[in-house]
Amino acid sequence: MTNWLQKRVRLSPKETALVFEGKEETFEEISEAVERLAGKLFALGIRKDEMIALLGKNDRMTFLLIHALQQLGAVTLFLNNRLTKKEIAYQLANAEVKQVIVADTFEDKVGAGISYSELAETDYKEPELLETWDLSRTASIMYTSGTTGKPKGVIQTYENHWWSAVASVLNLGLTEKDSWLCAVPIFHISGLSIMMRSVIYGIPVYLEEHFDEEKITQLLESGKVSTISVVTSMLERLLKIHGGSYHPNVRTILLGGGPASKTVLEICKQRDIPLVQSFGMTETASQIVTLPPKDALNKIGSSGKALFPAEVKIADDGEILLKGPSITPGYLHNKKATEASFVDGWFKTGDIGYLDEEGFLFVVERRSDLIISGGENIYPTEIEHVIGEYVAVKEVAVIGQPDDKWGSVPVAFIVAEETFDEDELQLICQTNLASYKIPKQIIIVEKLPKTASGKIQRNKLKERHSK
């Protein structure tokens, strides 16, 4: 297939591609800036098929770098800028990264790399850009924590991104007024998928560095944007500061990261806010199941139906299985995990759910014990492994606690030795865990509830802690 950005420039060069900090740039202007940047990367030795890590944020430079690496045919490992130096080091080693490109702000998180300021000073060398893309090639790698606690690198091909964009547009439609407001991280699939859709559809991305509900509300009222991707905590913050509906041009508030509550759905209905609930994951290159507004109140708690190219079914044990061209071919350098994730061509989500008589999907447990905090996936086992390394901890169990701002935050229950010192434990956590993974509360208990086979019952802890 023709290189997407080059094709888009030929189709609609003067249409707006990016709006950042009030400045609009066309696809032609973005393409020229990307080509200049690709030349600098090329001068620094970056070539096709090399694994290049990118540690940036939601800004113009990171946006351009993502495109530039694709133009060169490099594979981009997207690093979460909230991770610790130790967590990042694991991903760099596991992915066998050739080079790291890092925003100046985050230089202390990587041992060595090309900083944005160094890149700016690099001389241009005419790059070898890819005219066409083999859709089976790997475009991006994103690490997702597994229940073992060790992150796995999800392989995302150009085909995955293409079919995700096609599936979405077949469901949501496309108009000449469309533009997508991106206040979710572009190092996450939720943000990267917006960038891919922008080029494939020919629509602008309104990129925001942070989620500021006041500023986002102004944009939603301005008529400039038609679509925004949010997680539950973002939506709830928007609803708190805004009493009415948004501009008529806003036609999709795409919600991921768990279904909305009945209260939220009723507020959206009363205010004529077009909420579209969805279910997806890093492994499905964004949403793969969606619930349109017309079904929202009739199907409270449902994630909807599989998008046109995808299929969903429930295994005998209740696990949600998915099939479709947007699903990852597997995990990087991890044949065992890849094989364990597929059964007869169906991807095993690890989530438990059911389909009602009309084929609507209901997710009962979000990967059983997964904590979703402000859109970030937190696995209790990863935190438990870190806390368990402290010699004064006999046993530990981590659960999610409801939180007004983040949706959910981790809480640790610990069976401790007499020598236990909470300050020491906090230091261990700060060294080994991203800030959002550090337990917001530590509760000392005499024993943890267990099954007959000795497995810790987190559900019992949740029940006890909620009383």
UniProtKB/Swiss-Prot annotation:
Key words, A-Z: ATP-binding, Ligase, Menaquinone biosynthesis, Nucleotide-binding
SUPFAM superfamilies xref list: Acetyl-CoA synthetase-like
Claim: Nucleotide-binding is one of the keywords in the record: yes
The keyword Nucleotide-binding belongs to this UniProt entry's keyword annotation: yes
Annotated InterPro entries: AMP-bd_C, AMP-bd_C_sf, AMP-binding_CS, AMP-dep_synth/lig_dom, ANL_N_sf, MenE
Catalytic reaction equation(s): 2-succinylbenzoate + ATP + CoA = 2-succinylbenzoyl-CoA + AMP + diphosphate
Membrane-spanning intervals of the chain: none
Coiled coil ranges: none
Pathway annotation: Quinol/quinone metabolism; 1,4-dihydroxy-2-naphthoate biosynthesis; 1,4-dihydroxy-2-naphthoate from chorismate: step 5/7; Quinol/quinone metabolism; menaquinone biosynthesis
Record EC number: 6.2.1.26
GO biological process: menaquinone biosynthetic process
Record-level Gene Ontology MF annotations: ATP binding; o-succinylbenzoate-CoA ligase activity
PROSITE patterns named in the record: AMP_BINDING
Function: Converts 2-succinylbenzoate (OSB) to 2-succinylbenzoyl-CoA (OSB-CoA).
Family recorded in the similarity comment: Belongs to the ATP-dependent AMP-binding enzyme family. MenE subfamily.
PANTHER family, per database record: ACYL-COA SYNTHETASE (PTHR43201), MEDIUM-CHAIN ACYL-COA LIGASE ACSF2, MITOCHONDRIAL (PTHR43201:SF5)
Name of the protein described by the UniProt record: 2-succinylbenzoate--CoA ligase
Gene name tied to this protein: menE
